Design a protein with these regions (language model features):
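N-terminal membrane-anchoring/stem segments of glycan-assembly enzymes
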Residues: 1-65
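Catalytic donor-sugar/metal-binding loop of nucleotide-sugar-dependent glycosyltransferases
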Residues: 250, 259-273
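N-terminal signal-anchor transmembrane helix
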Residues: 37-73, 78-100
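Long helical/loop segments within the catalytic core of UDP-sugar-dependent glycosyltransferases
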Residues: 120-154, 167-252, 263
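Cell-envelope/extracellular polymer assembly enzymes that use nucleotide-activated donors
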Residues: 69-72, 102, 242, 257
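Acidic donor-binding segment of Leloir-type glycosyltransferases
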Residues: 92-136, 178
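Short acidic donor-binding/metal-coordinating loop in glycosyltransferase active sites
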Residues: 161-163, 254
Length: 273
C-alpha cells in the first residue's frame, strides 16, 4: 500500500508539482493539528485523573516481604561496558528481597567488551549473564524475547543499561498489581532524565518527557485508551506477555507496539505514580 502511495505521489509531483506540494502540506498540517488536539484532550483528562492505589512509603512498609513474588528483570545490553558498574549498583539498590530477583543481563554474542565488564563485576547469584546468539534481526526486542526463556518471575520488567530506577519501584508495582482489576496486566512507571539540569538539551528532553509521562500517558490511562509503552520500566505479567507473543523483534518501536497489542487482546495498561 505504501509503495502505491509513493508511486502516486511521484506521478502527481511530475504532473502538478506545486498543487501536489500544497495538498501534501495541507494534509500534514491537518494531521498534526488533530494529534495536537488529541494530546490536549489527554492532558486535560490527566488533570482530573487520580491514582487510587496508595504507594506511599508507609503503605510499602506494611508489605510482607515473605509473600512477594519472583521478579524477572531483563536488561538488554549492546556496547555498554562503561556503565555496567552503575547498572549493577542501581539494580542492587532496589528494595526487594534478592532471593526473589531473577536479573538477566542480555549481552549480544559479538559484544565481548560488555560481557567481560559483566564478568569483572563478580556478580551475586541473582544476576544471570546471558549471551544472545548472533542472528537476524539484532534488536533489543529479539534480545528480550530470548531472555524470557526460562524466566522465573511472575512479573517482568525491562531496564536499560543507563537507568536509575526508584529503589521502591518493584514493590510499588506488586502493590498495584495486587489491588487493581485483573484486566490490568502492565504498569508503566513514569520516566524522566536524572541529569535534567546539565544543559539546555537535557532540559528540553526533560520537558518533552514530562509532557508525555506526566500528562499524555496518564490522560490515556484515565480514558482507558491504549498506552504506548516507554522502552523501560514497564512491568508486565509474564503469563499474559507470553500469551500476546511478547515483543515483535522486527519492530523498532516494540514498546509502543506491545502496549497496543495488549489493548487489542482485551488487557489494560495503567501508570505508576
Amino acid at each position: 500500500f505504501l509503495g502505491i502511495v509513493a508511486v502516486l505521489i511521484i506521478i502527481f509531483l511530475i504532473w502538478q508539482f506545486t498543487t501536489t506540494l500544497v495538498v501534501i502540506f495541507a494534509l500534514a498540517s491537518i494531521f498534526y493539528t488533530l494529534t495536537s488536539l488529541y494530546k490536549l484532550v489527554a492532558g486535560y483528562s490527566a488533570l482530573e485523573h487520580r491514582y487510587l492505589i496508595d504507594t506511599s512509603p508507609e503503605a510499602l512498609d506494611l508489605m510482607d516481604e515473605r509473600t512477594l513474588p519472583m521478579y524477572t528483570i531483563l536488561v538488554p545490553l549492546f556496547r555498554e561496558a562503561a556503565v555496567i558498574p552503575y547498572l549493577v549498583q542501581g539494580i542492587n539498590s532496589l528494595d526487594y528481597p534478592k532471593t526473589k530477583l531473577d536479573v538477566r543481563l542480555l549481552c549480544e554474542e559479538e559484544d565481548d567488551e560488555t560481557y567481560q565488564a559483566i564478568i569483572d563485576q563478580d556478580l551475586p547469584p541473582h544476576f544471570n549473564p546471558i549471551i544472545v546468539p548472533a542472528s537476524d534481526p539484532q534488536t533489543k526486542p529479539k534480545a528480550c524475547n530470548y531472555g524470557l526463556q526460562g524466566a522465573k518471575g511472575e512479573y517482568v520488567v525491562i531496564y536499560d543499561a543507563e537507568d536509575r530506577p526508584d529503589p521502591a519501584q518493584l514493590k510499588k508495582a506488586v502493590l498495584m498489581f495486587d489491588n487493581v482489576d485483573e484486566s490490568i496486566v502492565c504498569i508503566q512507571a513514569k520516566l524522566n532524565f536524572f541529569n535534567q539540569q546539565t544543559n539546555f538539551l537535557t532540559r528540553w528532553f526533560s520537558i518533552e518527557y514530562s509532557m508525555l509521562f506526566d500528562l499524555v500517558l496518564p490522560g490515556l490511562d484515565a480514558r482507558k485508551d491504549p498506552i504506548p509503552l516507554g522502552g523501560t520500566s514497564n512491568h508486565i505479567k509474564l503469563k499474559e506477555l507470553v500469551e500476546v507473543g511478547a515483543w515483535d523483534p522486527y519492530n523498532v518501536t516494540e514498546d509502543a507496539d506491545l502496549g497496543v497489542r495488549l489493548h487489542q487482546a482485551g488487557y489494560r495498561t495503567t501508570m505508576m505514580n
